[in-house]
């Protein structure tokens, strides 16, 4: 049975980063290699690529902030919808990742190929739908949070261009999760870093202009983002087309398979909701904070930019754990599953402790990277020092949620995310905001993390340990 190969893009994979970056071809190392070096080898490329990616997001915001604070406010208001679109891409990719790893761990390679093929096709469909829906709702969505016509116009301009690349982003992230499922972390690191570097280099050129390239302002920032995503996808297409892969995209596997598609969505939908719930939360909190001052809205947007950077090392470890747990669970190596969970939890807690120290010691300089307004810096300094009190304990929730996704237990993972982003924090933020003012919103974050950690560990024990 011939596998489907996308057309070549004009250059060899060796020209991208070297042949060794695209090994290994045999994924049985996932159940034979010692746990600690295995997790580190799987997580480190993720950590590096995600740190570079988060750096790109911060650099992107730094360039936009140089336009004016209205542009930064527009980005903050667009963030929830942009995050939702990314959540659809990443969350459904988690479903692809988990099923491919589970089937390969169980030795069912044909089923793994079918899961990859259906996952890729559905990801492209999701991208088309997200482009149409997100572009249509943005003008009305932005107008709900600001009466400033300039901010609305900037937000519409930025989002329209970014969402035109949604299908590219969906396909790119589907390839990323597919390659991660078979342990090819160096490849995904290479592709992500290449896209990020492309974006960072294009940002100042397209935003402020250079030579014959006109200054495009916030539209240039959006276009740089889209081109960076396209560069990453091109690398995946070239590598898949020119090297042998443990998992194949097959035309014959595209025939309808409701059972397989149901399993993809059973894992993917909870993962999408896990990632999309922060968008719902940010929208809710923006509504509370906008009643006091737009500076609070800006601070919330800045915090989520910084949070991405602070959390991603731990998230990279969780991503490295996810296919390992799925593979070993499929191979019935339950002792290794438990060791992987415990090790990931400990490493994540250490990383988040470092993040807490950074936020406590350098809160004002961090906020000052994005705003020179004294009011915004003062508000942000207070916010960071309060919110970071919950960083260490949040490792329990993030590790448990990632482990459950890797095991294909998406509904249990969703329970944890609902606690973190809806059940606890929304009522707490509303109540504390009315009692303490906007500072109460910041306190709601750390209280929520403590409560959610208790629930997360209980859910993990019930779903995994006792079984």
Range-by-range predicted roles:
Residues 134, 177, 203, 207, ...:
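Structural signal for membrane-spanning alpha-helices in multi-pass inner-membrane proteins
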Residues 84-87, 131, 199-204, 233-237, ...:
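Hydrophobic transmembrane alpha-helices of multi-pass small-molecule transporters
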Residues 32, 36-55, 59, 81-88, ...:
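Residue-level signal for short hydrophobic patches within transmembrane helices
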Residues 93, 97, 162-180, 188-196, ...:
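Short runs within selected transmembrane alpha-helices of multi-pass transporters and secretion channels
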Residues 2-43, 100-167, 213-269, 325-390, ...:
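Short alpha-helical transmembrane segments in multi-pass integral membrane proteins
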Residues 72-132, 169-183, 187-188, 286, ...:
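Small-residue-rich hydrophobic transmembrane alpha-helices
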Residues 41-60, 161, 195, 228-232, ...:
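Transmembrane helical elements of multi-pass membrane transporters/channels
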Residues 51, 55-73, 142-149, 205-216, ...:
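Helix-terminus/linker motif at the lipid-water interface of multi-pass membrane proteins
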